[in-house]
Amino acid sequence: DYVEALEARGVPHLLVGGKTFYEREEVDAIRSALTAIEWPEDELSVYAAVHGPLFAVGEEELLEYHAAAHGFPPYRVPKDLPERLQPVARALETLRELHASRNYRPVADTIGRLIAATRAHAGFILWRGGEQVLANVLHISDLARRYEAEGGLSFRGFVDLLREAAGTTEAPEAPILEEGSE
């Protein structure tokens, strides 16, 4: 792949085309987490968010937690969990807190709190093409601000918008020009 070869050699470049914004793994990770925040009773969304790159909890721990807690209910996190299951509990507590406050603050603020709580900036920048990955993640916050500026009223509405957009292939990635490019 040309992009990977350019990135591996540190060659400044600007990709036009390629994967669309909504098909990117990092965008899917944020969308999954926002879906879990809006619908914490949706076990599949919660599983996807907690297992995905934001919380990065392993399958073994998730399956063990699921058996011990009878699911992934963010409002019924057991107190007597073994240490190896604490990352699951912390992730569920984060989702619960963000769910409880999501309608009392701007959508972009909830996204910012999610990114801060999971230290996503640090993780995403280490990915291949990390600057582009991080630009895409930050672009989601920009989309949230635009959504509200254009009259969007609810967190759920923004999540629905992201989910609908994921079914299309029209939006390009957030443009960034590599340092030193002209």
Question: Can you say where each PLM-predicted feature lies in the sequence?
Answer:
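Amphipathic, charged-and-aliphatic alpha-helical interface segments
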Residues: 67-70
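Conserved motor-region signature of P-loop NTPase helicases/translocases
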Residues: 1-55, 59-63, 74-79, 83, ...
